[in-house]
Each structure stands twice: as C-alpha cells, then as structure tokens.
C-alpha cells in the first residue's frame, strides 16, 4: 500500500512496463475487480482510493461514503493490482479543496443526465482526475461504462489537455437480477435491494419506440423516486429520438435515500464504420484486422471497383467508354465473401478474381472506370443493401460521404505520397509483380489522387464529421489501436462486446 508521494515515486521508478491506472473512491466491488483484471492484462496496475470532496454537494453522502481500506486492499490484490495508493487531500489539493479552484467540465456534456441534477459534480471529477493523472503518469486509464457520462467527459478532458494516456472503458458488471454493481448498493436494506431491481428491469423493457413517460411510470410503480429518465446521443450527450442508430437510455432514481443510476443502449441496427482515404493509405490492411478484432464484417468497396475494372479489361472494353461499361454491368454478378482471418474473396460471374484485381494493370485503370456514374450508382446500391443492417466496416473513397453518411464512426485514413509509394512497392513485391521506380510510383499515386478527388460522381473527400488519421510512422498495430479507441468512444462494450480471444 502506498500513501506518500515519495512511495508513489519509488513504485513508479521500479516499473518495467507502462503503468495502468484504476482510479476509485473505495468501497471496491467486483465491478472494480473487472477493471483491475482487464488492466492487468496490459501491465502493472495501480489502484487509487480517494474520496474526492469536490464531487459531493452539501447534504450528499461524503461523510458516510463507504470506507473499507482493508477490504479494498484484499480485493485489489485478488484481481491482480500491483499496488493500492491512498493519497491524502493535501497531496491531491495542496492549495485546498475548494470549488473556486476546480476545473470546469465542458458545459455541453453536463447539461443533461447527472450533470443537470448534480451541479458542480463533474467539475470535481475532472479536477481530481487531472491531478491523479499528473501524479501517476499512466499509459492506460481504466474506467467503467456504468458511469457513461463521466467516461465521455473524461475522454474530452484527456483530449483537451493532450495527455499521453489511453482511456479504456469496461462494460458494467451486474448482479444476477441486473442491478449494476455500485459502492452505494450497500446502503440498501434487504427490502430496498429487491425494489432496486426494478431500475434495470424498466430500462431493459424499453426499446427505441418506448416513450420516456412509460419508463418513468414503470419506475414510479415500483416505488422508486425518479430524478430523470432521458434518451441522449452517447457521444454528444444531447437529447435524441428514435431515429438515432445508437442511443443511451439513462435514469437516476432514489430507493429510500440511496441514489442509483443506470442505463441501457438502444440500437436500431448493428454498428457501421466507414473508412475512407486515398490510394495506398493502408486502408485494406488495417480495416481487415480492425473488423476481425471487433467482430464486424469487412467490406472492401475498392475491391468491387477493381472487379468491374478487371471485367472491363477482360472483355476488351475501353475503360473510358461509359455506355460499353454500363452494358457489362447489366449482366454482372459480383459477390464478396468474408474469409477466416479477415480476408475477402471476390467473385465475378462465378470466377474468383481476388488476386487478379490487385494487378498493376487494374490499378492503372480503376480510377477511370470508377468515375462513371453508372458504375458508382450500381455499386453504391449494392453496398447500401449490404450495410442496411450494419455490423460491418467498409473502406473506400466515398463511404462516409456518399455510401454510409450515417455511419457510427467515420475515419479518413491517409499518409504522404512518399509513404504510400513505399507501401505500394512493398505490396507489389510481396504479390510477385514487377516494382517500378519509386518516383514513378509517386507520380502514379499523385495522379490517382487527382483523378479521385476531381471526378464528378462521388469524389474522394473527407466527410465533415470524419476523424483524420495520418499514418506516417505508425505500425499497423498502432493504427488498429487508434481505430479501436475511436470506435469505443462511440460504441461501448455494452452495446457491441469485443469478441473473446
């Protein structure tokens, strides 16, 4: 157990791996244990126990908040923590714990849910977490999705301060009857504990068409005092309706004097991810691996345009002849099949062309063929049909802007021309094709960029709400990790769990 800053510094200096940090206010339970267990898979884990006075308004339960240090130490050790740190108020707030000195959480993120009912609470949260991160300097920060509003606000804090820490959200851990684990559950009497189960039950009973008043009525009928029931966008935390593909249905109630919060995620379809970018940015490689990691179907739309280009060349049709290309489309049978390991088989009229479409000859003509309105309309229609139920990640040139403008996550993956030429040369060599001079490859890529971005029909463009990711100097694993981090900021583990293994 660590108490002083000197002990913390000595612990930090002896680490051989990046530190993983689990901040708590004590009263540890299995939910905290799951955070520790998951964090321990990445490196040594430091658990802090600090009951933050700035998170409590006058009249709240600061004085009686559960304090059970010996039990906390035993649980942290059982789940694999390397150390438990119990800083003093003086350590965290050397100038005093006053609301006047607190950081301000983003106003837009605390207009609703708990932020509206507990003014100043999230200011206290961001203040203490910023200080804890300053003192611990971890590589990973592990937080529960149970406190979803807090998780969103802390992600924004880390982004605003440009802190070198990766935030990991972990799904809510529940009792057998659905009640979310919470340190405050121990306030409940046996009768209240049975009554509290109505909270998760009412949330589970709701779907995208259930009026909020119905959920409120169900909670009230169970004898719970309702503070709020709201449906919000999980990222902006602003109210939304049933048209939103993924929304957060959240509630706060009082069971006796105990305040309980919970939520459920409502989905009208499975997650949809759009990854766009210029040729040679590494989209196919990372998108395949990203899709496999998250259990999503991989849709390589570029392969579809390459397949049409291959057919055009096989039939001896001039790539620039739109009418002749359109005639080929009428009899086209283009099928994509996901393969084990994240690959994709491409079939054109019953023939496997998965390798043939990667030839330099196809690469040289695909922009011309893809620019035809008839081609884009035919393939876009097929792509939209494939993505209607979600559950896939698609990569191409205009996925986020034209094909799936309602995607949960849009990424514009790019790299410099020089870096893309280097990657293209390596790819050609690995596939057994002749490799041109680097300068020639760079010229081809620059010309391809020009053609893709200036065509009339669905040009290459970064969607206004897309995240730009420049991958120069990044390993494939680093790019995939960055994509997963962006995905999890929008789609929680609770809504779309990461597949085991």
Swiss-Prot record:
Sum up the protein's function in the record's words.
Catalyzes the condensation of pantoate with beta-alanine in an ATP-dependent reaction via a pantoyl-adenylate intermediate. Catalyzes the transfer of a phosphate group from ATP to either CMP or dCMP to form CDP or dCDP and ADP, respectively.
**Which reaction is recorded as catalysed by this protein?**
(R)-pantoate + beta-alanine + ATP = (R)-pantothenate + AMP + diphosphate + H(+); CMP + ATP = CDP + ADP; dCMP + ATP = dCDP + ADP
Spell out the residue ranges making up region: Pantoate--beta-alanine ligase: 1-264
Q: What keywords are annotated for this sequence in UniProt?
A: ATP-binding, Cytoplasm, Kinase, Ligase, Multifunctional enzyme, Nucleotide-binding, Pantothenate biosynthesis, Transferase
Q: Where is this region: Cytidylate kinase?
A: 265-501
Q: Which SUPFAM superfamilies match?
A: Nucleotidylyl transferase (SSF52374), P-loop containing nucleoside triphosphate hydrolases (SSF52540)
Supply the source organism for this entry: Parasynechococcus marenigrum (strain WH8102)
Q: Does the keyword Lyase apply?
A: no
Q: What is this protein called?
A: Bifunctional pantoate ligase/cytidylate kinase
For the ligand ((R)-pantoate), the binding residues are: 55, 150
Q: Name one GO biological process term.
A: pantothenate biosynthetic process
Keyword DNA repair annotated: no
Q: What is its main location?
A: cytoplasm
Task: Look up the record and name the pathway of this protein.
Answer: Cofactor biosynthesis; (R)-pantothenate biosynthesis; (R)-pantothenate from (R)-pantoate and beta-alanine: step 1/1
Q: Where in the cell is it found?
A: Cytoplasm
- Cross-referenced Pfam families, in alphabetical order? Cytidylate_kin, Pantoate_ligase
The residues the record assigns to binding beta-alanine are: 55
Residues bound to ATP are 25-32, 144-147, 173, 181-184
Source superkingdom: Bacteria
Query: Which positions are catalytic residues?
Result: 32 (proton donor)
Spell out the family assignment given in the record's similarity comment: In the N-terminal section; belongs to the pantothenate synthetase family.
| GO MF entries | ATP binding; CMP kinase activity; dCMP kinase activity; pantoate-beta-alanine ligase activity
NCBIfam families xrefs: cmk, cyt_tran_rel, panC, PRK13477.1
GO cellular component: a single term: cytosol
């Amino acid at each position: 157990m660590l108490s002083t800053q000197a002990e913390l510094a000595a612990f930090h200096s002896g680490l051989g791996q990046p530190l993983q940090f689990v901040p708590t206010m004590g009263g540890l339970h299995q939910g905290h244990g799951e955070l520790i267990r998951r964090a321990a898979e990445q490196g040594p884990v430091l658990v802090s126990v600090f009951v933050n006075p700035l998170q409590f308004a006058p009249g709240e339960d600061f004085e009686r908040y559960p304090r059970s240090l010996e039990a906390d130490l035993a649980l942290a050790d059982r789940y694999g923590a390397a150390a438990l740190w119990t800083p003093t108020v003086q350590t965290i707030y050397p100038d005093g714990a006053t609301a006047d000195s607190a950081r301000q959480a983003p106003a837009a993120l605390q207009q609703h849910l708990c932020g509206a009912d507990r003014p100043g609470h999230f200011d206290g949260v961001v203040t203490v977490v910023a200080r804890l991160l300053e003192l611990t300097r971890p590589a990973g920060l592990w937080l529960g999705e149970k406190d979803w509003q807090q998780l969103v606000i802390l992600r924004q804090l880390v982004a605003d301060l440009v802190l070198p820490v990766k935030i990991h959200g972990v799904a809510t851990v529940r009792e057998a009857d659905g009640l979310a684990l919470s340190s405050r559950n121990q306030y409940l009497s046996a009768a209240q504990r049975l009554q509290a189960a109505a909270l998760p039950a009412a949330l589970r009973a709701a779907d995208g068409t259930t009026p909020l008043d119905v959920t409120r009525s169900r909670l009230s009928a169970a004898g719970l005092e309702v503070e709020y029931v709201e449906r919000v966008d999980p990222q902006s935390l602003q109210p939304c309706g049933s048209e939103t593909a993924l929304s957060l249905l959240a509630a706060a109630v009082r069971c006796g004097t105990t305040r309980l919060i919970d939520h459920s995620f409502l989905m009208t379809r499975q997650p949809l991810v759009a990854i766009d970018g210029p040729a040679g940015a590494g989209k196919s490689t990372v998108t395949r691996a990203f899709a496999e990691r998250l259990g999503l179907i991989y849709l390589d739309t570029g392969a579809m345009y390459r397949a049409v280009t291959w057919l055009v060349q096989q039939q001896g049709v001039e790539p620039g002849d739109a009418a002749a290309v359109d005639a080929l489309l009428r009899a086209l049978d283009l099928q994509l099949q996901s393969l084990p390991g994240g690959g994709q088989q491409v079939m054109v009229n019953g023939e496997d062309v998965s390798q043939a479409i990667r030839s330099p000859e196809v690469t040289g003509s695909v922009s011309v063929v893809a620019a035809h309105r008839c081609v884009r309309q035919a393939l876009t229609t097929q792509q939209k049909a494939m993505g209607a139920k979600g559950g896939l990640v698609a990569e191409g040139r205009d996925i986020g802007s034209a094909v799936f403008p309602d995607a949960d996550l849009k990424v514009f993956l790019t790299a410099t021309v020089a870096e893309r030429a280097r990657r293209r040369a390596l790819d050609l060599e690995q596939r057994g094709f002749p490799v041109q001079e680097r300068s020639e490859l760079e010229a081809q890529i620059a010309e391809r960029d020009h053609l893709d971005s200036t065509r009339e029909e669905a040009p290459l463009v970064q969607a206004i709400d897309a995240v730009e990711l420049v991958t120069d100097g990044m390993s494939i694993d680093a790019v995939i990790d960055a994509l997963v981090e962006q995905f999890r900021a929008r789609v929680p583990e609770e809504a779309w769990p990461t597949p085991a293994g």
